[in-house]
C-alpha cells in the first residue's frame, strides 16, 4: 500500500521535496481518496493544498481525513468538476502546481490542469504506461492551451510494483479563457483530435 500510494505520489516531486519549507500552492484534480494531494500536504509542511473532486462522497471523506491528521488549515477540499472550477477567478491561474493521477488520458488532463497554473506553474500528470502516441496527442492539445511539455520522467517502483511516468507541462502564456470547455466536453472531444 505505502509504495503504491504514498511513494508513487511523492517520487515525481523529488526536486520540490529537497525544499520542503517553500510555500507552494498545489491543486490535486480528481483527488479521489487523496493521492497525491494528502501525501504532498504531509511531506511539505508549508504547502497549501486544494483537493478537487466531483464526488461528494469522496470530498466528505477527504475533509474528515484532513481534520483527523491536523491539516485542515492547509487543505481546502472542493466538490466540483475541474471544468467549472477552472473558470473561477479565485482558482484560475492561482497555483504553482496542478496535479492529476489516474484521471483521464494526458491530453484531456492537460485541459483540466493548465487553467489552474500561475505564470511559472507546472502541471504534473501521473501515468503508468506512457506511449509515443500519447505524447504526440498531448503536444497537440498543449498548443491549443498555450502550453508545452517540459519533460517526462520514467521510474521503476520498488519491489517490482510497476513502471510509473510523470509528465511535466507548463504554460508559455495565458491559457485561452474558453478552456476548460464545458463539463464532459474535454473527455468527449479531446483537444488532440
Regions found by a protein language model. Give the residues of each.
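Short glycine-/small-residue-rich Rossmann-like dinucleotide-binding loops
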Residues: 102-103, 173
Amino acid at each position: 500500500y505505502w509504495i503504491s500510494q504514498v511513494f508513487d505520489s511523492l517520487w515525481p516531486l523529488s526536486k520540490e521535496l529537497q525544499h520542503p519549507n517553500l510555500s507552494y500552492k498545489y491543486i490535486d484534480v480528481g483527488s479521489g481518496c487523496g493521492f497525491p494531494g494528502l501525501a504532498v500536504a504531509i511531506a511539505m509542511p508549508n504547502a497549501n493544498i486544494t483537493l478537487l473532486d466531483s464526488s461528494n462522497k469522496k470530498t466528505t471523506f477527504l475533509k474528515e481525513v484532513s481534520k483527523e491528521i491536523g491539516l485542515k488549515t492547509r487543505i481546502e477540499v472542493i466538490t466540483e468538476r475541474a471544468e467549472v472550477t477552472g473558470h473561477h477567478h479565485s482558482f484560475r491561474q492561482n497555483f504553482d502546481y496542478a496535479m492529476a493521477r489516474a484521471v483521464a488520458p494526458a491530453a484531456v488532463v492537460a485541459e483540466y490542469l493548465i487553467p489552474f497554473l500561475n505564470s511559472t506553474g507546472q502541471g504534473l500528470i501521473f501515468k503508468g504506461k506512457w506511449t509515443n502516441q500519447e505524447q504526440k496527442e498531448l503536444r497537440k492539445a498543449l498548443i491549443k492551451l498555450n502550453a508545452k511539455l517540459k519533460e517526462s520522467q520514467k521510474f521503476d517502483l520498488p519491489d517490482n510494483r510497476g513502471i510509473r511516468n510523470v509528465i511535466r507541462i507548463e504554460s508559455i502564456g495565458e491559457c485561452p479563457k474558453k478552456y476548460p470547455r464545458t463539463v464532459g466536453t474535454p473527455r468527449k472531444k479531446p483537444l488532440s483530435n
